[in-house]
Amino acid sequence: MKRTFTAKKFALVGTAIAVPLIAAAQISLGGIDRAPQAKKQHVELLTDALQLTANKPQDIELRFRVEPGFHINSHTPKDELLIPTILKLDSGSLHIADEQYPPGQHFRLQVGSGEDLDVYQGEFRVMIRVEAPKGATTLTGTLRYQACDTAACFPARTLPVQIAVAAR
């Protein structure tokens, strides 16, 4: 029995193969319905107020949470091409020193290269040493990060940091 492929059959087979490949490529490159995710903050600041002893250096923690299903690169990612998470604080009337980032968690990509990453997921804390004069002030700054899910990484974002500080 001789089988012949008509143009119609060939087009159907080609479409059956091409559509999943194109869809997979778009998903891995973040091309399908990713625009809303790219504009969204995937990290939130959990610390909103600090009570300190005036004129005494103290270690405090700034708590952040990464949205479930996402991760961000650690402060020291394994690849120099990856965007690190960086906290920049404006000292104002506060004396700030010794930022200490947590170690990243091991994470293996399930798509693409399958490379190992050093990331933050869930809740993480950055420790800082602060000395505040007596009174009320606001600790301000930014957290710069790049959020990724299992299929794509999104443009780097900057999260504003604003924390009320009362020193007595």
Regions found by a protein language model. Give the residues of each.
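Hydrophobic h-region of N-terminal signal peptides that target proteins for export
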Residues: 16-25
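Extracellular/lumen-exposed scaffold segments
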Residues: 25-168
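Bacterial N-terminal signal peptides that target proteins for export
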Residues: 2-17
